[in-house]
C-alpha cells in the first residue's frame, strides 16, 4: 500500500499568532460634571476612544446619556428611588458637561406604593418650559383613608377620579410653564408639585403618595453654550478628590527612618 502525502496535515497556518492588544490603551478617561442644581458635581468617569484621523473623541461623547441615582447626586439616601438622566452636551478639556435629560422612579418604589383597597390615579401632560423644552410629565397618586372612616376600602368614584385628574393636569401645567428647566428640576427634587396636588384635591377626595414619577424630554431647543455654562456655573476650581490629613505620628516615624 502506497503511503501518500496528506496535504491537509502538512499545511501550516498562514501568519503567526496574533499578539493580544489591550483595547484600553487606545481609550481615555473623562470626568462627568453634573449641573449646579445638584450638590455633588463630580459624578464619575467615562471612557472614549482617542481622536484618530477624522474620528474625534468629543463627537463620541456628545449625546451620551448617564443614569445616576439622586441619592448620589445630593448625598441623601432618602432620595434613592429617583433616577436622574444626564445628557452630555459639550466637552471641555477632560470634562464632560451634562444637562438634565429625564427622570424616572425605580421599579421597586412604584411596586411598594401600589396597594389593594385604594384607588390609583394616573395622568400625563405635555408642557413647554420658558426656555423652550417640551416635556412629558407623568403623575401618580393614591386615595387615602379619612380620619373617621370605618369602611375598609378607599375607592374613589369615577366622577371624583376625573376631577382629580383634571386638577393634576391643571397644577402640572401651571407649575411647569412658568419656569425654566433648571427651576423645574429644583421643584421635582423636594416634590413641590405632588404636595400642591394633595392640598388642592383634599376637598374632592383625600390623597397620599402623590409623585411626579417620570419626566421625558420630547423636544429640546438648539444647543447654546452660554446657557449650558450658566447651568454649570464655575466648575473649574473643584477638586476631584478630597485631601486626607496624615497623622502626626506617621510623619514622625518616617522622619526617624530617613535619619537612620
Curated annotation (Swiss-Prot):
Compositional bias (Basic residues): 1-18
GO MF term list: structural constituent of ribosome
GO BP term, example: translation
Entry keywords, A to Z: Cytoplasm, Ribonucleoprotein, Ribosomal protein
Alphabetized InterPro entries for the sequence: Ribosomal_eS1, Ribosomal_eS1_CS, Ribosomal_eS1_euk
Region (Disordered): 1-20
Record-level GO cellular component terms: cytosolic small ribosomal subunit
Protein localization: Cytoplasm
HAMAP family: Ribosomal_eS1_euk
Quaternary data: Component of the small ribosomal subunit. Mature ribosomes consist of a small (40S) and a large (60S) subunit. The 40S subunit contains about 33 different proteins and 1 molecule of RNA (18S). The 60S subunit contains about 49 different proteins and 3 molecules of RNA (25S, 5.8S and 5S).
Family assignment from sequence similarity: Belongs to the eukaryotic ribosomal protein eS1 family.
Alphabetized PANTHER family for the sequence: 40S RIBOSOMAL PROTEIN S3A
Name this protein carries in UniProt: Small ribosomal subunit protein eS1
Organism of origin: Ostreococcus lucimarinus (strain CCE9901)
Amino acid at each position: 500500500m502506497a503511503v501518500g502525502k496528506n496535504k491537509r496535515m502538512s499545511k501550516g497556518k498562514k501568519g503567526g499568532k496574533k499578539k493580544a492588544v489591550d483595547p484600553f490603551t487606545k481609550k481615555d478617561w473623562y470626568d462627568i460634571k453634573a449641573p449646579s442644581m445638584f450638590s455633588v458635581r463630580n459624578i464619575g468617569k467615562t471612557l472614549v476612544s482617542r481622536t484618530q484621523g477624522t474620528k474625534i473623541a468629543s463627537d463620541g461623547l456628545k449625546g451620551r446619556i448617564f443614569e445616576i441615582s439622586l441619592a448620589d447626586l445630593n448625598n441623601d439616601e432618602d432620595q434613592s428611588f429617583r433616577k436622574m438622566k444626564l445628557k452630555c452636551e459639550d466637552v471641555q478639556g477632560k470634562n464632560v458637561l451634562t444637562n438634565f435629560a429625564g427622570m424616572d422612579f425605580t421599579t421597586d418604589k412604584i411596586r411598594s406604593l401600589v396597594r389593594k383597597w385604594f384607588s390609583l390615579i394616573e395622568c400625563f401632560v405635555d408642557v413647554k418650559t420658558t426656555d423652550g423644552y417640551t416635556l412629558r410629565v407623568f403623575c401618580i397618586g393614591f386615595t387615602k383613608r379619612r380620619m373617621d372612616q370605618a369602611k375598609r376600602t378607599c375607592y374613589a368614584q369615577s366622577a371624583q377620579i376625573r376631577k382629580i385628574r383634571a386638577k393634576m393636569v391643571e397644577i402640572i401645567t401651571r407649575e411647569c410653564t412658568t419656569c425654566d428647566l433648571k427651576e423645574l428640576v429644583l421643584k421635582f427634587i423636594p416634590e413641590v408639585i405632588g404636595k400642591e396636588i394633595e392640598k388642592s384635591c383634599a376637598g374632592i377626595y383625600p390623597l397620599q403618595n402623590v409623585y411626579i414619577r417620570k419626566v421625558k424630554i420630547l423636544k429640546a431647543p438648539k444647543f447654546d453654550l452660554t446657557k449650558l455654562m450658566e447651568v454649570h456655573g464655575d466648575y473649574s476650581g473643584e477638586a476631584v478628590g478630597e485631601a486626607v490629613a496624615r497623622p502626626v505620628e506617621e510623619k514622625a516615624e518616617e522622619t526617624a527612618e530617613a535619619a537612620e
